[in-house]
């Protein structure tokens, strides 16, 4: 038998049962918070509502009931995003999985399959988490469509819900800084606009540190029941209780984006890569020499041209990195060090966001799916994972983002 034929563990039904058992990690905060739903096509449509605190009116007995629609006052429509990748397993792996030798050899191959499948599933779920985070933190989402075209979705978040503090108010060293007032103003705006009380606040550890050492917060803390050292033993809970900002989540997750160099680096600061879609200005790009162990250089990304497939860095790398051989990697936090984010996860009795799974493939499947393809010479098998969908935001006025200081100052 050739390839994966006759190997029960590589049958699609068995393979997908295995991968479906991998639990979405708790670190994927938004994926666990908001539900997923199957949509009827790959063109996702949704209604948007601004303000959702209405109630049924009184009427006189015997009178006609007033009508109310289920639709919001705005609508969105976009093609679903599609993502996939694959992993190769060689001939030795296939032979071991057929159990020609010892049982221990077979178990080793099974563990290799399970580890590879789990990594693919984890990366696929990570992409969903990134999409929801981009939608909430930035109010937009960009991705590739057919023909290599870049598609961007705007979710209709009011501009008043994105606030960048000026130098005098910045939370790090602004002369008139007042994080307490800014946070309460944000909370009040969500209440006034969306008619709901925000119950989640999100920041990373760097922003939490800025708040911990803020003089006004420490002064308030000294007058409260928390002046017993709790601020540093459980800082998130104390800050949340002190400011009345609901569940404060410290979200330190990072994501990684990779691309292969298409041309060899020179003295130019313009770098050509095979896919610049997910690279962002302000991040750091790491150049890896793939012929050497753990050899790299870091440069700051100044700008990105996704259509041209170029990244402009602050300074060209001192070493030469070869196109087609070496790669670049950007690592970036889901939420930047200078952002404080607040939102309500529900309005009008329903979740404010949802992930719409779109159908794809000849069998019209939804959500995560794994399949295989045999290689003839040398013998091996590719394990591929796929997913398709789009996050939607039903209540755009339930979020609020404060950019508290310039990252260059930190």
List PLM regions with ranges.
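Glycine-centered loop/turn motifs
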Residues: 58-64, 71, 264-268, 282, ...
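A generic N-terminal leader/anchor concept
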Residues: 1-58, 281-288, 304-305
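Long, contiguous amphipathic alpha-helices that act as assembly "spine/axial" helices in icosahedral shell
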Residues: 80-158, 178-209, 379-387
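Extended oligomerization regions of viral-like shell subunits
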Residues: 194-258, 330-354
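Autoprocessing Asn-cyclization modules and mimics
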Residues: 255-324
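Glycine- and small hydrophobic-enriched segments that form the cores of compact globular domains
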Residues: 162-174, 178, 185
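Assembly/oligomerization interface modules of large self-assembling protein complexes
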Residues: 31-99, 152
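Hydrophobic, glycine-enriched assembly/anchoring segments
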Residues: 2-13, 331, 349-410
């Amino acid at each position: 038998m050739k390839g994966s034929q006759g190997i029960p563990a590589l049958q699609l039904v068995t393979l997908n049962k295995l991968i479906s058992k991998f639990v979405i990690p708790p670190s994927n905060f938004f994926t666990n918070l908001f539900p997923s739903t199957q949509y009827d096509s790959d063109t996702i449509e949704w209604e948007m509502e601004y303000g959702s605190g209405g109630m049924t009116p009184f009427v006189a007995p015997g009178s006609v009931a007033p009508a109310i629609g289920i639709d919001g006052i705005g609508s969105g429509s976009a093609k679903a995003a599609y993502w996939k990748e694959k992993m190769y397993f060689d001939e030795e792996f296939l032979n071991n999985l057929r159990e020609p030798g010892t049982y221990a050899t077979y178990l080793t191959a099974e563990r290799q399959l399970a580890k590879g499948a789990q990594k693919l599933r984890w990366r696929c779920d990570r992409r969903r988490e990134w999409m929801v985070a981009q939608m909430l933190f930035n109010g937009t989402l960009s991705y590739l469509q057919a023909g290599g075209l870049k598609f961007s979705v705007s979710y209709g978040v009011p501009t008043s819900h994105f606030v960048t503090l000026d130098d005098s108010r910045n939370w790090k060293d602004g002369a008139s800084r007042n994080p307490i007032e800014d946070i309460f103003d944000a909370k009040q705006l969500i209440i006034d606009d969306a008619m709901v009380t925000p119950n989640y606040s999100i920041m990373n550890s760097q922003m939490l540190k800025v708040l911990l050492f803020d003089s006004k917060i420490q002064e308030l803390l000294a007058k409260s029941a928390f002046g017993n050292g709790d601020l540093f033993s459980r800082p998130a809970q104390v800050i949340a209780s002190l400011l009345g900002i609901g569940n404060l989540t410290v979200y330190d997750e990072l994501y990684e984006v990779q691309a292969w160099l298409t041309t060899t680096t020179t003295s130019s600061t313009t770098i050509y890569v095979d896919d610049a879609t997910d690279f962002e200005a302000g991040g750091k790009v790491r150049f890896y020499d793939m012929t050497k162990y753990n050899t790299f250089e870091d440069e700051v990304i100044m700008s990105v041209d996704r259509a041209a497939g170029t990244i402009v860095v602050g300074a060209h790398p001192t070493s030469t990195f070869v196109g087609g051989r070496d790669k670049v990697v950007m690592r970036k936090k889901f939420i930047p060090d200078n952002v404080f984010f607040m939102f309500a996860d529900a309005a009008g009795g329903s979740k404010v966001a949802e992930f719409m799974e779109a159908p794809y493939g000849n069998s019209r499947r939804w959500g995560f799916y794994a399949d295989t393809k045999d290689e003839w010479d040398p013998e091996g098998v590719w394990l591929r994972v796929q997913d398709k969908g789009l996050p939607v935001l039903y209540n755009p006025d339930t979020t609020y983002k404060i950019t508290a200081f310039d990252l260059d100052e930190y």
